[in-house]
Amino acid sequence: MSAPQTFVPEPVQVTENALAKVKALIEEEGNPDLKLRVFVTGGGCSGFQYGFAFDEACAEDDAKIERDGVTVVVDAMSYPYLVGAQVDYEEGLKGSKFVVANPNASTTCGCGSSFSI
């Protein structure tokens, strides 16, 4: 009998558009060690908001998603809020931005930049 295995879900799905934009931004910076950090902080009119930053380092407890040469990291505190979420990159008349479609969010504010669970 084999030992039981623990299933740890990948916290975030990253679309092709988001991957392409992250790759382009990393190339602009000229630092192949950069990783996209996706995180949740308190704030906004609904209680939580998403954050994006480039980071060279990973903490021991960061979740890492590696795809097509891009690494996305999620810290342990943000992980439960982002399981099942999808990060996309949108360009439109109002500008361009990374967006998160999060099935865990019960409500979002009118502008879409904050959410509650």
Curated annotation (Swiss-Prot):
Alphabetized UniProt keyword annotations: Iron, Iron-sulfur, Metal-binding
One GO biological process term: iron-sulfur cluster assembly
Stored Pfam families: Fe-S_biosyn (PF01521)
Residues given in the record as iron-sulfur cluster binding sites: 45, 109, 111
GO MF terms held by the record: 2 iron, 2 sulfur cluster binding; 4 iron, 4 sulfur cluster binding; iron ion binding
Lineage top rank: taxon: Bacteria
Cofactor field: iron-sulfur cluster
Family according to the record: Belongs to the HesB/IscA family.
Subunit structure: Homodimer.
Protein purpose: Required for insertion of 4Fe-4S clusters for at least IspG.
Name of protein: Iron-sulfur cluster insertion protein ErpA
Organism of this sequence: Saccharophagus degradans (strain 2-40 / ATCC 43961 / DSM 17024)
Name of the coding gene: erpA
